[in-house]
């Protein structure tokens, strides 16, 4: 498995390109915008796109996912269906904030414990509400690698002051669902640099073992 990051939208959201090295088939996770930039990155990589994966329904993560899916003939998998609330607002939110954003219907809603395939890779789906009610994390166990969206960042956690956000749900998701995966798991967050769960358990002011003790 390999992965690359392409920051998109004015919010510099980390769209991830992941691919199976055995088959050269890949997926874009959270193609929120800047589609020309994303298509150029995919073309440079030589990866054959197989699908689009979505962590949650906020517009910087999926505002143009439906447009890209139609253009390239790709299915969309994710998020969990509680985020229909956010996806149904994409047109309205895009107009409000001056970003390209269109409502779409995923081909497959995901649930906790589901798996998604990319080439020969199998990613585990972990439902992690709190920032958004239908937020999911994608975890590749053999590589100890996760794409966590806006659940967790280097040194911070996702905002919970949006509609249907819940701070305690987010803390519980991180400590009860992500930490048990192992300190040696590397993750790509929705914004900012990569980190490891172990590093965040040591130093994150919101969810370190010390902060929660």
Question: Where are the model-predicted features located?
Answer:
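Conserved beta-strand segments of alpha/beta enzyme cores
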Residues: 2-4, 48, 75, 108, ...
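Short acidic-hydrophobic surface loop/beta-edge motif
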Residues: 6, 18, 112-118
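Short Gly/Pro-enriched turn/cap motifs at secondary-structure boundaries
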Residues: 6-8, 99, 105-107, 127-129
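Active-site neighborhood of phospho(di)ester-bond hydrolases with catalytic His/Asp-centered motifs
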Residues: 28-29, 50-57, 77-80, 127-130, ...
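Short, glycine/acidic-enriched loop or turn micro-motifs at the edges of active sites
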Residues: 22-23, 33, 59, 83, ...
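Metallo-beta-lactamase
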Residues: 91-93, 115, 121-213
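Conserved beta-strand hairpin/beta-sheet module of binuclear metal-dependent hydrolase folds
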Residues: 1-45, 137-149
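Active-site HxH/HxHxD metal-binding segment of metal-dependent hydrolases
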Residues: 33-117, 202-210
């Amino acid at each position: 498995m390999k992965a690359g990051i392409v920051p998109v939208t004015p919010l510099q959201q980390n769209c991830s390109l992941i691919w199976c090295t055995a088959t050269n088939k890949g997926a874009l996770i959270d193609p929120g915008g800047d589609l020309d930039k994303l298509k150029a990155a995919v073309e440079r990589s030589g990866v054959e796109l197989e699908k689009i994966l979505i962590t949650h329904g906020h517009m910087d993560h999926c505002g143009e996912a439906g447009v890209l899916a139609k253009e390239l003939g790709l299915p969309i998998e994710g998020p969990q269906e509680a985020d229909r609330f956010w996806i149904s607002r994409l047109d309205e939110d895009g107009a409000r904030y001056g970003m390209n954003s269109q409502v779409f219907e995923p081909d497959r809603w995901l649930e906790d414990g589901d798996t998604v395939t990319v080439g020969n890779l199998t990613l585990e789906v972990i439902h992690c509400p709190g920032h958004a009610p239908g937020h999911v994390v994608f975890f590749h166990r053999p590589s100890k690698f996760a794409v966590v969206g806006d659940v967790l960042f280097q040194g911070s956690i996702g905002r919970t002051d949006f509609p249907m956000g819940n701070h305690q749900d987010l803390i519980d998701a991180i400590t009860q669902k992500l930490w048990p995966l192992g300190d040696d798991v590397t993750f790509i967050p929705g914004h900012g640099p990569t980190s490891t769960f172990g590093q965040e358990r040591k130093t994150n002011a919101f969810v370190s073992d010390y902060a929660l003790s």
